[in-house]
């Protein structure tokens, strides 16, 4: 499986993932986020200034995520990724919001 195929699986087949970050005391914190898009540079998701999740990402710059899809352990697929996070601004915002409307 190529990296782009892996990203496609996470985005399109799994979509909702559990993300781990650390807080200001370096204690682990998890939340569920939806992966909205992907390309050869990485995965894309939405958050906003003022949210604790956004603050943790800005403060530490790394996350770990895991997602699973399937009916049970023997009939499922899972994926785990860790890495650096960067803010991309508003350049992809319209596309991401359009994709989000499919899930709302």
Describe the predicted segments one by one.
Residues 1, 38-39, 97:
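Generic detection of intrinsically disordered/low-complexity segments and helix-coil linkers/edges
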Residues 1-23:
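Extreme N-terminal tail/first-helix region
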Residues 3-5, 30-32, 52:
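A generic local structural motif
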Residues 4-9, 44-50:
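Short charge-dense sequence patches
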Residues 10, 34, 43, 97-101:
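Broad hydrophobic/π-residue packing in well-ordered secondary structure
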Residues 15-49, 57, 63-67, 76-81:
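Short beta-strand segments
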Residues 52, 56-104:
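Short, structured beta-strand-loop surface elements
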């Amino acid at each position: 499986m190529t990296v782009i195929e892996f990203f496609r699986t996470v985005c399109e087949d799994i979509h909702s993932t559990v993300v781990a970050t650390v807080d200001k005391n370096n204690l682990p914190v998890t939340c569920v986020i939806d992966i909205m898009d992907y390309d050869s540079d990485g995965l894309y998701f939405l958050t906003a200034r003022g949210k604790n999740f956004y603050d943790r990402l800005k403060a530490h710059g790394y996350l770990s995520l895991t997602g699973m899809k399937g009916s049970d352990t023997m009939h499922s697929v899972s994926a785990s990724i860790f890495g650096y996070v960067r803010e991309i601004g508003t350049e992809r915002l319209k596309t991401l919001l359009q994709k989000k409307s499919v899930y709302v």
